[in-house]
Amino acid sequence: MAKQLHAQVDIRATPERVWEVLTDFAAYPEWNPFITEARGTARVGERLTNRMQPVGGRGITFRPTVLEADPRRRLRWLGRLVAPGIFDGEHTFTIQQLGDGQVRLVQHEQFRGLLAPLMAKSLDRHTLPGFELMNQALKRRAEQP
């Protein structure tokens, strides 16, 4: 059984600007309240090192592998806890052009594995609010002149 989370925000910025903010991992400590630290590059096959601070939860470090990096459109990675099939999270950031100088940033994550059903309530309580906080913070940063 899979668990899915979804959060989106409309941003008055170009897809290029949103992509720039999203993939400037070194700057995450300056603005991102959810993924408070990130190292690596947005390149397929790259293994990132991310520090996540779930809302009301304990911080964890995880090492997702970039599956897709389509500039100005999509960044997708896969993180695993312990081993494949235990608790896997495939996270996608999609940038959609809306016109009139706006884009929509959509975060979507699908969790699978033996622990996914057991973690469902915790993901709703701690992780989804983190997505929403990150979206709002990214919006503020991308809309700055």
What is each residue range found by the language model?
Residues A7-V9, T61-E68, G79, G89-Q97:
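Hydrophobic/aromatic beta-strand elements that line small-molecule binding cavities or substrate pockets
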Residues R12-E16, R43, L67-R73, T94-R104:
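A short, structured loop/turn motif at beta-sheet edges
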Residues A2-Q8, R47, T61, R74, ...:
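Intrinsic-disorder/low-complexity, polar/charged segments enriched in Ser/Thr/Lys/Arg/Asp/Glu/Gln
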